[in-house]
Amino acid sequence: MKDAQLNTFCQRHQAVLINSASNSITVAVVDAPSHALLDALHFATQKQIDIVCWTRQQMENHRHKPDQAPSANAAKGGETAAQLLNQTLRSAMAKRASDIHLEPGASRYRIRLRIDGVLHILQDIAKETGLALTARLKVLGNLDIAEHRLPQDGQFTVDLMGDSISFRIATLPCKEGEKVVLRLLHQVEQTLDLDTLGMYGAQLTAFRQALQQPQGLVLVTGPTGSGKTVTLYSALQTRNTPGINLCSVEDPIEIPLDGINQTQIHPRAGLTFQNVLRALLRQDPDIIMVGEIRDGDTAEIAIKAAQTGHLVLSTLHTNSTSETLIRLQQMGVARWMISSALTLVVAQRLVRKLCPHCKQRLSDPVVLSPNLWPSALPRWQASGCQHCYHGFYGRTALFEVLTVTPTLRQLIASGASAQALEAHLQQTGTGTLFENGCRAVEQGMTSFEEILRVLGMPHER
């Protein structure tokens, strides 16, 4: 179809053809294109179709111009959106970002990158460019471009820097427009090895011993984004041999692994954690991994599996090892079941590592109460350099490991308070998260300010 015909065709659908190149066309619409327009355009031309969202005032201004022929200058918004998207994705990859946030404001859009768990501003862009970028992302993610009132989720893959990179897109209607978050699904090959997790001697020994048991429940706890998944998969890999039947139920399957029978739940189809767990017990499993214990039913099935000759690994959203014991009781699991099945609890957090190229030790130390840490801690500063951009490069995990001893089993079964459980942990555990964080500060791995950001200041004992 010729450009003149395309222009007339677009006008019938209250749209404007603003650019036509050899392999693409750019069409401007008010707010968002209709399904009828998109379907008709795909039928009329084989070229790539780029949509630019204009305000009603922009459309009126365009219609009153004496020359309305498609031009390269008029298509600047569409070209800018395409170029900006490519630049943003490249910046995210170069800076090791895990997420990209596109946030609408009253007059401008803000783009932020989450790097090592912290958001950093990349740039602000014009409102029109932000709208065009949002529309382009929704088309890439196969979302309903005309829907602005409801959240949407999708996924797309692009060729970037010589690799095929996948992104998960999620939109959310906000006061000033649609907020878009992209999650980079591209992951660098990661060695799933217990020795590389960051546990020190006593913690690693306790973890290995629990994983070699023929049965029992091992829980890894912490908030979202604390590294639980890598710890869990590393644990599975230590037992991944031809003589063992490893099964998992996950939402979603985050790291595909050879040798493990991985099942992803599908609640809409009736495939829930509970249903899959019951089915797995009829699959002659040796070790079962449950991606997350979300409710009492799942917890009870997992514990029963751990009591009947299976080693069960799972995660729970709690802040510490002692809190995990209380949370299971709050879920409705009987105390005797917890005390008989639970063998080990690991709590963890991720902290940013100081950049080795620009970190400096300052003269004034950090002095804490002796009840919290007995000696002065070095104070570190990293101002940022060409290697790290912000003073930190990468993250490492802090761990708190609690082995369930016979004494602790009695405390759980008798309904001991959180304070009593915490006191027992202080006497027999391998150190709290805060104590192990202070150890990392002593070693120059991270700063005390970073420990406070992630853990906060604990109460004195």
Q: Each predicted region: which residue ranges?
A:
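Short alpha-helical interface patches
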Residues: Q11-V16, A21, T45-Q46, I51-Q68, ...
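A short, compositionally biased micro-patch
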Residues: S20-A21, A44, G105, Q213
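Charged, low-hydrophobicity low-complexity segments
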Residues: F43, D50-R90, K95
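Short glycine/Trp-rich loop-beta-loop segment that forms part of the substrate-binding cleft
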Residues: T26-N61, G198-R208
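Short, flexible helix-loop junctions that flank or precede catalytic/ligand sites
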Residues: C10, G78-S91, K95-R461
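Core recognition of P-loop NTPase motor domains used across DNA-transaction enzymes
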Residues: T8-Q11, A15-I18, A36, A40, ...
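Polyanionic, low-complexity intrinsically disordered segments
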Residues: M1-F43, Q152-M161, I165-A170
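Short, basic, glycine/proline-bearing loop/turn elements
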Residues: N23-I25, A69-A75, L192-D193, N261-T263
